[in-house]
Amino acid sequence: MKIVTAIDSFKGSMTSMEAGLAVTEGVHRVDSDVDVQIRPLADGGEGTVEALVAGMNGMKQEIQVTGPLGTPVVCEYGIIESSKTAVIEMAGAAGITLVPDEKKNPLYTTTYGVGEVIKDAIGKGCRRFIIGIGGSATNDGGIGMLQALGFGFMNKNGQPVPFGARGLEELETITDTYVIPELKECEFRIACDVTNTLCGEQGASAVYGPQKGATPSMIMQMDKWLAYYAALAKEKFPKANAKQAGTGAAGGLGFAFLTFTNAVLESGIKIVLEETQLEEYIKDADLVVTGEGRLDRQTAMGKAPIGVAKLAKKYGKPVIAFAGSVERDARECNEHGIDAFFPILRGITTLEEAMKNENAKRNLADTAEQVYRLWR
């Protein structure tokens, strides 16, 4: 008997690997001979570094970088030595969670730290990059990241523009004279599940600006500045296309990657499933187990568990899912490859208690045990 687990993290509660271990514990209470293969899962957002480092035999790295407010933060990323691949979550260097509510202001927040992480990984020999760009605090069009990599963004006096979206207002010239030479050898797979363009009603500023602290007047200004930046970039880099889907991701970071580096934007779950080679594990499995913290209609619209389920159904494998909470509309998941799903809560409790790491792991193990007794 072979069971493959590929469970997304229960955010704020347990990691993907912890969830897999909990299921293993529950199954082995019934039959210790069952071969349970734990494959970490993520969707390109939070938990991607954790999942890919575990799934690809990587090592975690820590580096102090310039945070979104211009002050130092410690960012964790992963290196897969065998393939010289770095796994980075931009939110670790420029994420919204690093900015207190009272300091949210995209005119000043920068992606400079993201570039510093990339530069550090290049210095350690990496030439492949997997980067999740969700959860940003920024709207600087990625110029901060590019500045850290050696690109010049100059004002009319030939001086570097300041950090943040306000730097775009002063922008007159873009140079690549001092770009680190190894950058041209690098390939970037960017985990991006939004289709917003750089500018306009569905652009970076209009759609995501408010949650980053932008006022209506700021949104109008930043949209205008980003449009000018895109036009200026196109003069030097003809492939620049501000209307391409995903260029508005992470405050224009998607545009920066596509224009200034050798990058492709891809579905986060697609990247994770391919990089962890989950398909090879599923081919001869008897059962596939997936899940996430909350199962609902949004899950059915293409979140990580559905990616797993679709892969499993390619080989006719049964799929069950576990979740911390299950909404009534989660039944739509049954139409997308999940044969049955189960909440793991054992009784009435507070959210705080339910999300405690030890409680969550115990509840998942107990539920997995009972479900396996029925399934075997």
Stretches found by the model and what they are:
Residues 1-133, 137-376:
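N-terminal loops that bind phosphate or other acidic moieties
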